Amino acid sequence: MPGNSFGKMFKLTTFGESHGVAIGGVIDGCPAGLEIDTESVQNDLNRRRPGQSAIVTQRKEPDTVEFLSGIFEGKTTGTPIGFIIKNANQKSKDYSHIKDTYRPSHADYTYDEKYGIRDYRGGGRSSARETACRVVAGSIAKQMLKSVSFNAFVSSVGKIELNKDYSELDFSEIEKNPVRCPDPEMAREMEAYIKEIRGDGDTVGGTVQCVIKNVPIGLGEPVFDKLHAELGKAMLSINAVKGFEYGSGFEGTKMRGSEHNDHFNTDGSTQTNLSGGIQGGISNGMDIYFKVAFKPVATLMQKQQTINSKGDEVEMQGKGRHDPCVVPRAVPIVESMAALVLADYYLQNKSSKI
């Protein structure tokens, strides 16, 4: 199974399944001499951890990262950084009823058809549990990019949308509520709606917006490796993601060029930022901002019609512990994938000219 690695110079390879002994990863290409704050890495993991509030899955995992190599006396050695996160709270029996049944809109059918075998326990390799490894690597990437800030937050849940420009928001409010919305009033409304959805045995989608500040000019490569293209790939690789837009996004299609152009100031900055901090696939020093769309979780506590591996029509109902809405826990994942992209291009940019 290829496709388990991300990045060129700052490269992450992950391994493990949802109900296996552990998940883990190897980070290759991290420069030597970088001081690593392992407590900060763990704090980022805690933000993604299941069971942290009443509106997420109640699977209880400590998600404690254990570094195996590449860090000595608090600094990177330049060798591969290996780490594992042990799985502690698997309940594989919750999935015995889907051993031969395909859950609608899950990876069950496609994995079975492609590989002829699948780990049905929690989705195996297709589970979002794998994203914990991305958070570890992304946290280290953020520490390498010390001057760059990454702030992701929930901007909508279902039809409840935060209609404010990010410049009007106080990012310090993000972690003060379980939804991770920086507007306290909207956060309460979103939280109540998620609880209502959970009570119905249903799920709901939403969006996560990310704002990256103090980005160096020059990150990204022309043509096929544009910065926004790699950000899009990174975000679309996250479980349940259905869409990605940056800068003016689809709203830009409704504007005239005379309205959309970002005019320069004499210092090279721009008076507006509809480009989203990227021009010609290369960062221009302005804020990079984008939005990621997440679908409703496919596992429902309601009865659904589906088929089994023999092609027979059957009825199934979800069991186990699942998120009614993934966006609150997706916030640190979005930040981490953005950090991996920028860290990779930061190292590549070091070789762009002599």
Swiss-Prot record:
InterPro entries: Chorismate_synth, Chorismate_synth_AroC_sf, Chorismate_synthase_CS. It catalyses: 5-O-(1-carboxyvinyl)-3-phosphoshikimate = chorismate + phosphate. Its EC number is 4.2.3.5. Its cofactor is FMNH2. One of its GO terms (cellular component) is cytosol. FMN binds at R125, S126, S127, N239, A240, G280, K295, P296, V297, A298, T299, R321. NADP(+) binds at R48. It comes from the Bacteria. Pathway: Metabolic intermediate biosynthesis; chorismate biosynthesis; chorismate from D-erythrose 4-phosphate and phosphoenolpyruvate: step 7/7. The keyword Repeat does not apply. Reduced FMN (FMNH(2)). Keywords: Amino-acid biosynthesis, Aromatic amino acid biosynthesis, FAD, Flavoprotein, FMN, Lyase, NADP. GO terms for molecular function: chorismate synthase activity; FMN binding. GO terms for biological process: amino acid biosynthetic process; aromatic amino acid family biosynthetic process; chorismate biosynthetic process. Belongs to the chorismate synthase family. This reaction introduces a second double bond into the aromatic ring system. Homotetramer. This is Chorismate synthase. It comes from Christiangramia forsetii (strain DSM 17595 / CGMCC 1.15422 / KT0803). The lineage of its organism: Bacteria, Pseudomonadati, Bacteroidota, Flavobacteriia, Flavobacteriales. The gene is aroC.
